[in-house]
Amino acid sequence: RKNVFANLGFDSFTSEEYMSEQDDTNPNDWVRDHNLTKYILQAMESTEGPDYVYSISVQGHGDYPEEPVLENPKITVSGASSQAENYKWEYYCNQIYEMDQFIKELTDELSKLDEDVVLVMYGDHLPTMGLTVTDVKNKYLFQTEYVIWDNMGLEKQDKNLAAYQMAAEVMDRVGIHEGNVFRFHQARRNTKNYQVDLEMLQYDILYG
C-alpha cells in the first residue's frame, strides 16, 4: 500500500504499525476503528488548504468466532442455522455497533471544523459469512452500500454507482472538474459508448 498510494498521488501514508493505538484491538486482533479519528483529523489539519484523505478501517474483518468471545455484548443474536452461526453473527453485529459509534464520533468532530467537509463511507465487500444470493435483499453478492455525509447542505441523492465512479461523482457535486478521467466520468457516464470510450481513455493514459 505504501508504494501504491504514492503512485496514486498521495503525499503521505500512515500504516497501522506507526499508530500508538495499534494494541487497541478487538478479540480478532483487528485495530478498533475509533482509533482512526485522531489520524484523520491530523491529516486534515496538516495543510491550510483542502485535503483528500483516504482511510481504511479493519475492525469488521473476520474470521468470525464460532464460540462466545464477548463478555457483555450490546447485541445478542438467535435464529441462525446453528449456535455456531449465532455466535459468528453476534460477534459481527457487535463490531458493527462499535463501528457505528466511531462514525458518530468522527462526524461529530468533523462538524466542528471551520471548513467544508464531505465524508464518503463504503464497504469494499460483504462479511465473510458464506452468504449466497438468497441471503441478501438485492440478490447481488458484489454490491455494498455507500453513505455520504457533509457539512455543506448538499442535496441527498440516491445513485447506483460503480466504485470507480464514486470520486468523480463527489467532486462533481462540490464543483470540482479537474483531471481528464474525472471530467470523462462526469460528462459521459450516461452516454451510449461510455464503457468502450473509458477503456480507450485508460489505454491512452497508460500506454498512449
Annotated model-derived regions:
Residues 1-208:
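Solvent-exposed soluble domains appended to multi-pass membrane proteins
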